[in-house]
């Protein structure tokens, strides 16, 4: 499984990329691999304010449906409608296929997430 440096990871297998006050959120390579071929993606409304642990969206595959959670408090600025039109983009490039771009409400919440080396260890225990 690919784990990229420079991202933050949640125990629910979401990744967070920080750029200034904005974050990009998606699901990890492990998550997409576990789900299999993704056939449907549901995203939140632009303007939604979500707290850490809230459902950000839904990803469905031929095997299962899975909620995607926001690992940090956010206000959704943009959604990636390309994923709605072609959900398989997540399978092909999970780290390039962000689900939302959002305003990060509390940067200190990033400290509760894992960095790449911690996430790799976490995956070994899964």
From Swiss-Prot:
Keywords: Lipoyl. CDD domains: GCS_H. SUPFAM superfamilies: Single hybrid motif (SSF51230). Pfam families: GCV_H (PF01597). The modification N6-lipoyllysine is found at residue 63. Binds 1 lipoyl cofactor covalently. Residues 22-103 form the Lipoyl-binding domain. The keyword Zinc does not apply. PROSITE patterns: BIOTINYL_LIPOYL. The glycine cleavage system catalyzes the degradation of glycine. The H protein shuttles the methylamine group of glycine from the P protein to the T protein. This is Glycine cleavage system H protein 2. It comes from Caldanaerobacter subterraneus subsp. tengcongensis (strain DSM 15242 / JCM 11007 / NBRC 100824 / MB4).
């Amino acid at each position: 499984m690919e784990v990229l440096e420079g991202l933050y990871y949640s125990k629910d297998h979401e990744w967070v990329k920080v750029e200034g006050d904005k974050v990009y959120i998606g699901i990890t390579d492990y998550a997409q691999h576990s789900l299999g071929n993704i056939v449907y993606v549901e995203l939140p409304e632009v303007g939604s304010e979500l707290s850490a642990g809230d459902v950000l969206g839904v990803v469905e595959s031929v095997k299962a449906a899975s909620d995607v959670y926001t690992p940090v408090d956010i206000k959704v600025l943009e959604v990636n409608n390309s994923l709605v039109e072609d959900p398989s983009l997540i399978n092909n490039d999970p780290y390039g296929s962000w689900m939302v771009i959002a305003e990060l409400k509390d940067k200190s919440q990033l400290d509760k997430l894992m960095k790449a080396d911690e996430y790799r260890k976490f995956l070994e225990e899964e």
